[in-house]
Curated annotation (Swiss-Prot):
Belongs to the PNP synthase family. PANTHER family: PYRIDOXINE 5'-PHOSPHATE SYNTHASE. The record marks E156 as: Transition state stabilizer. The lineage of its organism: Bacteria, Pseudomonadati, Pseudomonadota, Gammaproteobacteria, Chromatiales. GO terms for cellular component: cytosol. Homooctamer; tetramer of dimers. Its main location: cytoplasm. This is Pyridoxine 5'-phosphate synthase. The gene is pdxJ. It is found in: Cytoplasm.
Amino acid sequence: MNTQTALRLGVNIDHIATIRQARGTPYPDLVEAVRIVEEAGADIITLHLREDRRHIQDRDVEMLRERITTGMNLEMAATEEMQAIALRIRPQACCIVPERREELTTEGGLDVLGQEARLKAFCAPLLAAGIEVSLFVEPDLAHLDAALRIGAPVVELHTGAYASAAPGPDREAHLERIVAAAAHGHARGLVVNAGHGLDYENVLPIAAIPVMHELNIGHAIVARALFTGIGEAVRAMRAAMDRARR
């Protein structure tokens, strides 16, 4: 029996906003960027409203909620402020991530084991509002089991350690953890996504995991867009993911 699921591409637009915020200009226009990204094959648009507002701004979330035609995946910390924003904006999906002001980017998965009760209470009103809630977790079986107890229907596996490892035994070991975690979560009814640090090469083994549902990728796509344009960068990532599934 073929258990392979259709693989979705979530394009993270944070670093398009980073370029805008570097000079405080009205460009690049995120609405136009999203239009091109969606036409090029993105299945969902991901954006992270950080507490320090270093790239995505509140007005972006409000405006894009009305303009995105595929779906909005709002990444956010588990704070009262972010919960209130999500309940007001009602994105199609939200991903709960850990956050530290001094980090350059999200550095790891949520400590779901250490704050299980808190996360369950945090997620409950989001789920009740019809928002698809995912938890950004390490590829660890105990964390996936905790996500189930919390009630989140989706997990996003943190691929940062895999992506940062040099090709060879170390990266293979990280890949094996991700494969095992994906199978474990899928067997227990979780929808399994993945993301962080994925590029046009290291995405291939992750995309090849049969039960993987969605990959969220941003920095590599925006970096390639400097040379090819954002539409072609998205199409190239979509093509790489499709090759891995053949």
